[in-house]
C-alpha cells in the first residue's frame, strides 16, 4: 500500500532522516523529517496561476500543535488559536531562505505547511523544518532547482562553536545564530549575539556553512531516489514591453534623481501611470506591464549607481543619512526618544511595571515569563498610504523581534533592575531601515528611563548591488535600494561588538568575502551612529523620573513566606491596601515593593515586616480601636493581628466608660501583657507613655491597693474569656473591700517573676 522511501545520516551524533510515501500522499510534495526525537511533516502544494500576477504568492506556515509537546491547549475551546510569535518567526525564517530561489517570473501559488508532530524539547524545530521544506520542494515537481540546508550555531564561554545546540546549551550560549546556504554561498542569517566581534561572527557563519554540506548531499540523494524532477520554467516573454519602456528611460532617470522621497515617489507615480495608460491602450496586459516596469526600474537604478558612483539620494556608497535625535520628548512617560535618520523616523516610548506585568509566553519549550517586551508598529501613514490600521502582521512581529534581539544582550539582570520593561516603537515615517531606527531609539529611550543598560546599541542596514563578479556594498540603504538591490543585511551592536544580525537576499546567495566586507563596513557606520547618539545621551539616568513607581527589595525567611501571604492572600492584600503599594514575594523569599514614592514603599516594607514578626510579651506596638464593648476594647494591631484590652487598662485613672477615653478608629501605643489560650494578645494602654511610646515609669492608678490584686487579675482574665452568652453581672467577681498584702507592682500573665512585665 505504501511506497516508502527513506534516507538518513548521522549528523554530528544525532540521526537526521527524510521519509516520503506514507503520510499526506495527495500533496505535491510530502516529507517527514526526523532529527533526534523531533519530527515534522512538511507538505508542498502548488496551484497553477489562473491570472497573471506580478509577484510570487508563496505562503509558509509552521504549526506547533499542543499534542506535539504532550499538552492540551488552554482556554474555553481547548483548541489552538492564532499562530504564536515563535511559529510566525520560524515561518519567516523558512520563507526568507527559499523565496529567492524560485525562478524569476514564476508566479504560481505555493503553499508550504510544516506540522510539528512531536518535539523532544532538545532539538529546536527550526533546522529540521527548513531541511524538510527543501526536501519537499525538491520532490514536488515545482521549478525549484537549488538545494540548501539550515543550521544553528552556538558558542560557549571558551569561544568554541556548537553545532545545533540543545535548548539547554543555547541558554548558556554567547551566540544564537541560524543560517541557510548551499554548497558555495550564504543565503540567510538570523542571530542574537552577546557582543562578539565581527571576526568571531564570521567564523561562526563559516563553521555553520561547513557543517551544512552533509545535509545538502542527503537532500540531493533523497530527491534522486524519489525521481520526481523539478520541471523547467520559461518566464513570460516581456521583451516587447521592455523595448517600449526604453522610451521612458530619461523620465525614470529624472524621477530617481530627486533626493527627497516624497518628490521622488510622486515623480515615479506620474511616469508609471503614463506608461500603464499608454501600453494598456496598445492592448498589453496590465499585470505584465507592472511586472515589466519593476524589472526595468531594477536594471535602470542599478546601472545608474554603478555608472555615477553615487546613490539615489546622491550619497556615497558608505555615507550615512543625516541623523537627528531627541530624548525625553514625552515628559510624562517613563522614557521616550525620537530618532530620525533621513526620511525614516521612530518614536520610541518605554513603560516600567511590576512582575505582575510580565508576559506569560506559551512556548513550545513550556510556559515562561518575559520581563522585557519590545513592540514594533508600522502604521500606513508612515509611507503615505491611506488604509486602516490592523493587528500586527508577520513583518511587524519579525522587525520587533529583531530589535528585541539587538537590545536584549545589554539589559541588566532582573536582580539589578527588578522592573518589567515594555518598549513600543511607533514608526512615524519610513524610507528604509525602520527596524534599525527602532534599535537606536530604544537604546536612547531606555537610558532616558534610567534602565542601566551595559552600553548603547545602534543598528544599520547594508545593501548590495551585484553584477557578475563585481559588487557594491551600500551603507544605510533607502527603501528603494532595498527593493531594487540584492541584499538587506541588518547589523546592530555596541562599540564593543555585534548584538544582532539579519540578512535577507534577493539573489541565490553571496560569498564569505561579501559577508566579511559588509560586516566591516557596517561597523564603521555603527560607530558613526553611536557617536551621534552619545552626543545626546551617553549613559542612563542616575535616578528614574519622579512619576515612575519606586521599587524596594528585601528578603524574608523562606519559612515566613506563608505568613507574609496569609490565608488566601489576606495579609498581603491588607498590606497593599493600607500602603497603596504592590508587593510581590518570590519563592526565594525576595520581597519587591512597588509604590509611587519611596515613603510609601518604606511604609509597605515596615508593614510587611511587622505582619510576620512574632508578637512577644512586653512588646510595645501600634493599635487601632475597631470595636468598643462595655468593658472590652477590640483592637486591630497595625501588623494585621487582632487584640483585646480591658477597661482597666485603658487609662491610668478611674474609667467609668471606655467611650470617655477612646473612640472607634483611634490609634495609640499599647503594651502586650499576656496572651489568651488561642494566641490573641491582651494589651494595655495605660502602661505606655503615649507621648514617648515607651514603658510608663510613673506610679499607676490604685497600685497602692495591696489586697485584691490577684482578684483583680482574675477579674481581668475572666472578662476576656467570657463566652458571649454568659451574663456579665452574674460572673462579675466581687471587688475586695480592704487589705494590703504587699507593696510590689502586680505581675501579669504567669505569676512568675521571670515572665512578668511592669
UniProtKB/Swiss-Prot annotation:
Q: Which UniProt keywords apply?
A: Cytoplasm, Magnesium, Metal-binding, Nucleotidyltransferase, RNA-binding, Transferase
What does the UniProt entry say about where the protein is found? Cytoplasm
The region called Disordered is annotated at 707-758
Pfam families hit by this protein: KH_1 (PF00013), PNPase (PF03726), RNase_PH (PF01138), RNase_PH_C (PF03725), S1 (PF00575)
Which PROSITE patterns does UniProt cross-reference here? KH_TYPE_1 (PS50084), S1 (PS50126)
Any one cellular-component term (Gene Ontology): cytosol
Broad class of where this protein is predominantly found: cytoplasm
Q: Which residues form the KH domain?
A: 549-608
Q: Which domain of life is it from?
A: Bacteria
Give GO BP annotations, semicolon-separated: mRNA catabolic process; RNA processing
Q: List all Low complexity biased stretches.
A: 711-721
Where is Mg(2+) bound in this sequence? 482, 488
Q: Which CDD domains match?
A: KH-I_PNPase (cd02393), RNase_PH_PNPase_2 (cd11364)
MF-aspect GO terms: 3'-5'-RNA exonuclease activity; magnesium ion binding; polyribonucleotide nucleotidyltransferase activity; RNA binding
* Keyword Magnesium (UniProt): yes
Reactions listed under catalytic activity: RNA(n+1) + phosphate = RNA(n) + a ribonucleoside 5'-diphosphate
Q: What class of enzyme is it?
A: transferase
Question: So what EC number does this one have?
Answer: 2.7.7.8
Q: Identify the cofactor(s).
A: Mg(2+)
Where would one find the signal peptide in this protein?
none
Q: Where would I find the S1 motif domain in this sequence?
A: 618-686
The record ties this protein, via PANTHER family, to: POLYRIBONUCLEOTIDE NUCLEOTIDYLTRANSFERASE, POLYRIBONUCLEOTIDE NUCLEOTIDYLTRANSFERASE 1, MITOCHONDRIAL
In terms of HAMAP family, this protein maps to: PNPase
The protein's job, in short, is:
Involved in mRNA degradation. Catalyzes the phosphorolysis of single-stranded polyribonucleotides processively in the 3'- to 5'-direction.
Q: Which family does it belong to?
A: Belongs to the polyribonucleotide nucleotidyltransferase family.
- What is the recorded name of this protein? Polyribonucleotide nucleotidyltransferase
Q: What organism is this sequence from?
A: Wolbachia pipientis subsp. Culex pipiens (strain wPip)
Its taxonomic placement starts with:
Bacteria, Pseudomonadati, Pseudomonadota, Alphaproteobacteria, Rickettsiales
Amino acid at each position: 500500500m505504501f511506497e516508502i522511501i527513506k534516507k538518513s545520516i548521522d549528523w554530528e551524533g544525532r540521526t537526521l532522516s527524510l521519509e516520503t510515501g506514507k503520510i499526506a500522499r495527495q500533496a505535491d510534495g510530502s516529507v517527514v523529517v526526523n532529527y533526534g526525537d523531533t519530527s515534522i511533516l512538511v507538505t508542498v502544494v502548488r496551484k497553477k496561476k489562473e491570472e497573471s500576477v506580478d509577484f510570487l504568492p508563496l505562503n509558509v506556515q509552521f504549526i506547533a500543535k499542543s499534542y506535539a509537546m504532550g499538552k492540551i491547549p488552554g482556554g474555553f475551546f481547548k483548541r489552538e488559536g492564532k499562530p504564536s510569535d515563535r511559529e510566525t518567526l520560524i515561518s519567516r525564517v523558512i520563507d526568507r531562505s527559499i523565496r529567492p530561489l524560485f525562478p524569476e517570473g514564476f508566479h504560481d501559488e505555493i503553499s508550504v505547511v510544516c506540522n510539528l508532530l512531536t518535539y523532544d524539547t532538545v532539538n529546536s524545530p527550526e533546522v529540521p523544518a527548513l531541511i524538510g521544506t527543501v526536501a519537499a520542494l525538491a520532490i514536488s515537481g515545482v521549478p525549484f532547482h537549488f538545494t540548501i540546508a539550515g543550521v544553528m550555531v552556538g558558542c560557549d564561554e571558551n569561544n568554541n562553536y556548537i553545532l545545533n545546540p540543545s535548548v539547554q546549551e543555547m541558554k548558556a550560549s554567547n551566540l544564537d545564530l541560524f543560517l541557510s546556504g548551499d554548497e558555495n554561498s550564504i543565503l540567510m542569517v538570523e542571530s542574537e549575539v552577546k557582543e562578539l566581534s565581527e571576526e568571531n561572527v564570521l567564523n561562526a557563519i563559516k563553521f555553520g556553512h561547513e557543517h551544512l554540506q552533509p545535509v545538502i548531499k542527503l537532500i540531493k540523494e533523497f530527491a534522486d531516489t524519489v525521481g520526481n524532477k523539478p520541471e523547467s520554467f520559461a518566464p513570460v516573454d516581456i521583451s516587447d514591453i521592455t523595448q517600449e519602456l526604453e522610451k521612458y528611460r530619461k523620465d525614470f532617470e529624472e524621477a530617481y534623481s530627486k533626493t527627497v522621497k516624497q518628490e521622488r515617489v510622486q515623480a515615479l507615480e506620474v511616469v508609471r501611470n503614463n506608461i500603464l495608460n499608454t501600453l494598456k491602450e496598445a492592448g498589453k496586459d496590465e499585470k505584465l506591464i507592472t511586472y515589466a516596469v519593476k524589472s526595468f526600474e531594477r536594471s535602470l537604478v542599478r546601472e545608474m549607481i554603478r555608472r555615477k558612483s553615487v546613490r539615489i539620494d546622491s550619497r556615497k556608497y558608505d555615507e550615512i543619512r543625516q541623523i537627528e535625535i531627541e530624548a525625553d520628548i514625552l515628559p510624562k512617560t517613563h522614557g521616550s526618544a525620537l530618532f530620525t535618520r533621513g526620511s525614516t523616523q521612530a518614536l520610541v516610548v518605554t513603560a516600567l511595571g511590576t512582575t505582575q506585568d510580565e508576559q506569560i509566553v506559551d512556548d513550545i519549550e513550556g510556559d515562561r515569563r518575559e520581563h522585557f517586551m519590545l513592540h514594533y508598529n508600522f502604521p500606513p501613514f508612515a509611507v503615505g498610504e491611506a488604509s486602516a490600521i490592523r493587528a500586527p502582521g508577520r513583518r511587524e512581529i519579525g522587525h520587533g523581534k529583531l530589535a528585541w534581539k539587538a537590545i536584549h544582550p545589554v539589559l541588566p539582570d532582573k536582580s539589578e533592575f527588578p522592573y518589567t520593561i515594555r518598549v513600543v516603537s511607533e514608526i512615524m515615517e519610513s524610507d528604509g531601515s525602520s527596524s534599525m531606527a527602532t534599535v537606536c531609539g530604544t537604546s536612547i529611550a531606555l537610558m532616558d528611563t534610567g534602565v542601566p543598560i551595559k552600553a548603547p546599541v545602534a543598528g544599520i542596514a547594508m545593501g548590495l548591488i551585484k553584477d557578475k563578479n563585481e559588487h557594491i556594498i551600500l551603507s544605510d540603504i533607502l527603501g528603494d535600494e532595498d527593493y531594487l538591490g540584492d541584499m538587506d543585511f541588518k547589523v546592530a551592536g555596541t562599540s564593543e561588538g555585534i548584538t544582532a544580525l539579519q540578512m535577507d537576499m534577493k539573489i541565490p546567495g553571496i560569498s564569505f568575502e561579501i559577508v566579511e566586507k559588509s560586516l566591516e563596513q557596517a561597523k564603521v557606520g555603527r560607530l558613526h551612529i553611536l557617536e551621534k547618539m552619545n552626543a545626546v545621551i551617553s549613559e542612563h539616568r542616575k535616578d528614574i523620573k519622579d512619576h515612575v513607581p519606586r521599587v524596594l527589595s528585601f528578603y524574608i525567611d523562606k519559612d515566613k513566606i506563608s505568613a507574609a501571604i496569609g490565608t488566601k492572600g489576606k495579609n498581603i492584600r491588607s498590606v497593599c491596601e493600607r500602603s497603596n503599594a504592590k508587593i510581590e514575594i518570590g519563592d526565594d523569599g525576595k520581597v519587591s515593593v512597588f509604590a509611587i514614592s519611596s515613603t510609601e514603599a518604606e511604609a509597605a516594607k515596615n508593614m510587611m515586616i511587622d505582619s510576620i514578626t512574632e508578637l512577644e510579651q512586653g512588646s510595645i506596638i501600634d493599635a487601632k480601636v475597631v470595636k468598643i464593648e462595655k468593658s472590652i476594647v477590640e483592637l486591630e494591631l497595625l501588623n494585621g493581628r487582632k487584640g483585646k484590652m480591658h477597661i482597666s487598662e485603658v487609662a491610668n485613672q478611674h474609667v467609668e466608660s471606655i467611650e470617655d477615653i477612646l473612640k472607634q478608629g483611634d490609634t495609640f501605643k499599647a503594651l502586650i501583657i499576656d496572651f489568651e489560650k488561642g494566641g490573641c494578645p491582651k494589651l494595655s494602654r495605660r502602661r505606655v507613655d503615649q507621648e514617648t511610646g515607651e514603658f510608663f515609669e510613673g506610679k499607676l492608678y490604685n497600685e497602692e491597693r495591696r489586697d485584691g490584686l490577684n482578684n483583680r487579675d482574675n477579674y481581668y482574665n475572666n472578662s476576656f474569656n467570657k463566652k458571649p452568652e454568659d451574663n456579665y453581672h452574674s460572673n462579675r467577681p466581687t471587688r475586695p473591700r480592704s487589705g494590703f498584702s504587699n507593696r510590689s507592682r502586680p505581675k501579669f500573665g504567669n505569676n512568675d517573676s521571670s515572665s512578668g512585665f511592669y
